[in-house]
Amino acid sequence: MSDTNKYRIEVQPMPQFIPEQSDPENDRYIFAYTITIKNIGEVPAQLVSRHWIITDGNNEVQEVRGLGVVGKQPLLQPGESFQYTSGSSLTTAIGTMKGTYQMVAEDGTHFEAEIPEFVLASPRALH
């Protein structure tokens, strides 16, 4: 069993602009994102913490760290997925998010799961 396949987590983000909660005239843009986390490795692994890097359209960077996601620290068996929805607020109509989840495998090995960069954009920001 190679370590490359042993500790593997797939992360799929799906962002969405929330117009009814946004107020563009006051530089307030609200986004929701649904994240699917799947254990594609060979051992059970628990998500223990997160690290987000959020960049707005002015290249202002905000880093967010915390335990778990939405108050949970899910333990994922091989082949199992966990999905959650959360949100972010920007002062610009476009931005990006990326980061990592800190994971601990059942055997005590610590590893990171990459959250691929995704775009947060109000519909008019892309035209």
From Swiss-Prot:
PANTHER family: F-BOX ONLY PROTEIN 3, POLYMERASE DELTA-INTERACTING PROTEIN 2. InterPro entries: ApaG_domain, ApaG_sf, Uncharacterised_ApaG. It comes from the Bacteria. GO terms for biological process: error-free translesion synthesis. SUPFAM superfamilies: ApaG-like. PROSITE patterns: APAG. Residues 3-127 form the ApaG domain. This is Protein ApaG. Pfam families: DUF525 (PF04379). Disulfide bonds: none annotated. It comes from Dechloromonas aromatica (strain RCB).
